[in-house]
Amino acid sequence: MAKVTVMGSTGTIGKNVTFKLAKEDVVSEVVLFSRPESIDNAKGQSYDMYDALAAEDIDCLLTPSCNFEDLAGSAIVLITAGVHRKEGMNRRDLAFVNAKIVANYAKQIALHAPDAIILVATNPVDVMTTIALDASGFDRNKVIGVGNHLDSLRLKTYFARRLNINSSEIHTRVIGEHGDNMVPLLSSTTIGGIPLKYFIREVEIDVLEIVKTLRNAGNTIISKKGATEYGPAYAISNLITTLITNTHKILTVSLYLDGEIADVKGVCLGVPSVLSKNGNAMIIPIHMNEYETNKFRKAAEEIRTLTEDVRESLKEDD
């Protein structure tokens, strides 16, 4: 049984992750961490969740807090805090604003929960993962971004629905940036163990259109209902329970690269990794075709440039 802290627990994703985690058998306590001005909201969330948990005879401690000392003993600290992109705000603007929040929280985690694994969900997640790594001083395998895990689940869903096949038969993955430069690994996608390219020959399927839909998935949901909730929350909960239970699943998360894939170094990107409870995330080297390799390297350069600019901005603010 593990203690998990959710920083940004009153946000749309934060509160959904908190409730999902509270229902997991492997979680004994969830700290609903918030800013002081939002602590009443966090308390209200906990009261509401307790009522729901009682209906299912679930016993999980929910601790609303704005005190960093309550991070102590956390096995995992999830950072979801930050601003959301507003009209007229681009990814670069978002990165500069959220970097200050993430850096501050990462420093506090290092001080109060030095043995925890940091899981970053704040966007742009690949840049924010590097910022959290810098600020915490942790080993690179103990600072993990949610990366392309949700993107991979979305791609799996699209193929399953289009081909009318159970999603458990779809094995596919998205790597690279969680954003415009994501790289769907179509060359290694299989359906029931059969390469995707053989299905394409038999079924009319526009792969480029599916990829476009995948990249716009989040915006499509936001335009229709205002926010993405369940997909991100369940994807994040899946990552956390995988870390806690030590099941060694291979999931696509954002990690700091040192040449393991396509010779890319010094940047955080979504890559397939074996996750364990001690934070020993092991990156799996993979084979890609030329197109995928070039797209992955392009993603690396764009994220690297933005990351360095954000790093310089943080230095100027110190």
Functional labels for PLM-detected ranges:
Residues 10:
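Conserved glycine-rich cofactor-binding loop
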Residues 33-74, 305-315:
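Conserved N-terminal Rossmann-fold NAD(P) cofactor-binding segment
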Residues 136-142, 151-318:
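C-terminal substrate-binding/catalytic lobe of Rossmann-fold NAD(P)-dependent dehydrogenases
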Residues 6-7, 32:
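Hydrophobic Val/Ile/Leu positions in short beta-strands of Rossmann-like dinucleotide-binding domains
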Residues 90-156:
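Rossmann-like NAD(P)(H) cofactor-binding subdomain of soluble oxidoreductases
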Residues 1-4:
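Extreme N-terminal starter segment of soluble prokaryotic enzymes
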Residues 54-115:
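Rossmann-like NAD(P)-binding element
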Residues 14-15:
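N-terminal Rossmann-fold NAD(P) dinucleotide-binding loop
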